[in-house]
């Protein structure tokens, strides 16, 4: 893989979806162009900024300033932080606030935040007046490389993650890499799991580049922009081929079947961030694949080694409160995986691996070997 160049101008990645195509604009301080871009996209539109309390303290004023400079009217909706806001109550709060702000069909909702805000604001926009367009301004690494791109929106159910939702594409994504400087180390690491996922599922050269360059990526600079852009290009290409996840878009769920079950078992709490669940889930998927003879055990070890090297959890035992009831229970985890979105007619579908850079969709996976695998992993505590 070629070394990244220093970018004096933003990088633009197109999501090619015909008359619903949109741009992902990546670079430092691209948020400064938000007002100008909205004015061109939707002249005369009013906006409502949906964000959470933490992001509001740092980025709401800046966002309002760039909208003011472009003469764009704006309201704001502030919700609590974390997965608890991705709920029926959170959806009601946002929808009612948008209605109170008199947001109409020709106006825009702005999702200013991480993956939770993007999912919640996008879902609310998709429902409001049967569909209002929205703009993604992702403020976490995870959101910039994954959840802000592709149009998946939704909330969680007590029975599982992202079970209530819609496909609703944004009209613009602004990925300001300067915003990532304000993330905690743990938040940044969690987002990095999704970056590594793109290499693990379909680009061994990118994975090797990450192994060699992750230190520079974590410290900022051109490597960070290169990683975000490479990740977005990978996702944009898959979304353009399979917008509604009827085929190979499911590959993007590498690590998510195990990971979502672990998130649900931990109550969608700060005990396990989404990216951390994905990291553990990818390692479990790789190890399960190796046990089935699908990939070399050395590749599974390589994946686990790299994720651990950057500080991500890679084992069930790395989760806080691991021994609490509901987590160290193979049957409970199997029941949660049975609610996975990829389940068809009650049969499990996993994203497994044939090697680094070669993920595959495995349909009709028998539950007994999965349960046995989990029981053995749990017994290693």
UniProtKB/Swiss-Prot annotation:
Compartment(s) where it occurs, according to its Swiss-Prot or TrEMBL record: Cytoplasm
Binding residues annotated for NAD(+), in chain numbering: 81-86, 115-119, 139-140, 152, 161
Binding site residues for Zn(2+): 194, 256, 274
Molecular function terms from GO: 3-dehydroquinate synthase activity; metal ion binding; nucleotide binding
Entry's EC annotation: 4.2.3.4
Cofactors required: Co(2+); Zn(2+); NAD(+)
Primary localization: cytoplasm
The reaction(s) this protein catalyses: 7-phospho-2-dehydro-3-deoxy-D-arabino-heptonate = 3-dehydroquinate + phosphate
Cofactor note as given: Binds 1 divalent metal cation per subunit. Can use either Co(2+) or Zn(2+).
Keywords tagged on the record: Amino-acid biosynthesis, Aromatic amino acid biosynthesis, Cobalt, Cytoplasm, Lyase, Metal-binding, NAD, Nucleotide-binding, Zinc
SUPFAM superfamilies xrefs: Dehydroquinate synthase-like (SSF56796)
Metabolic or biological pathway: Metabolic intermediate biosynthesis; chorismate biosynthesis; chorismate from D-erythrose 4-phosphate and phosphoenolpyruvate: step 2/7
GO annotations of cellular component type: cytoplasm
Any Gene Ontology biological process: aromatic amino acid family biosynthetic process
Metal-binding is among the record's keywords: yes
HAMAP family, per database record: DHQ_synthase (MF_00110)
Stated family: Belongs to the sugar phosphate cyclases superfamily. Dehydroquinate synthase family.
Function (record text): Catalyzes the conversion of 3-deoxy-D-arabino-heptulosonate 7-phosphate (DAHP) to dehydroquinate (DHQ).
Stated name of the protein: 3-dehydroquinate synthase
Organism: Rhodopseudomonas palustris (strain ATCC BAA-98 / CGA009)
Gene name as annotated: aroB
